[in-house]
Amino acid sequence: MGSLIIEDLQESFGKEAVKGKEITVHYTGWLEDGTKFDSSLDRRQPLTITLGVGQVIKGWDEGFGGMKEGGKRKLTIPSEMGYGAHGAGGVIPPHATLIFEVELLKVYE
């Protein structure tokens, strides 16, 4: 089993994302071969989620933890923390490692 790799691309001093908080993010996701499979930036529509409650893949729930508003990270997410043996929607193959660049836009109180 692989482990989540978190690389801070841009640190910030805004409010911190913690479990149970609602956050708004921008993201772009790629497969290991460089194939882009999704991007909120391309749609110009950020995503709002509640962190740490299973609304998103485990790699996101853990990868956004401790991040601060305005920060950017690269998350390399092993299959077990992504979509596993099933893949997703015909776009993400089974057992795929996922690479995301994410930006934390807002942490709500």
From Swiss-Prot:
One of its GO terms (molecular function) is peptidyl-prolyl cis-trans isomerase activity. It holds the Pfam family FKBP_C. PANTHER family: 39 KDA FK506-BINDING NUCLEAR PROTEIN (PTHR43811:SF19), FKBP-TYPE PEPTIDYL-PROLYL CIS-TRANS ISOMERASE FKPA (PTHR43811). The keyword Isomerase applies. InterPro entries: PPIase_dom_sf, PPIase_FKBP_dom. Residues 20-108 form the PPIase FKBP-type domain. The lineage of its organism: Bacteria, Pseudomonadati, Pseudomonadota, Betaproteobacteria, Neisseriales. PPIases accelerate the folding of proteins. It comes from the Bacteria. Keywords: Isomerase, Rotamase. The gene is fbp. It catalyses: [protein]-peptidylproline (omega=180) = [protein]-peptidylproline (omega=0). It is an enzyme of class 5 (isomerase). It comes from Neisseria meningitidis serogroup C. Its EC number is 5.2.1.8. This is FK506-binding protein. GO terms for biological process: protein folding. Belongs to the FKBP-type PPIase family. The keyword Protein biosynthesis does not apply.
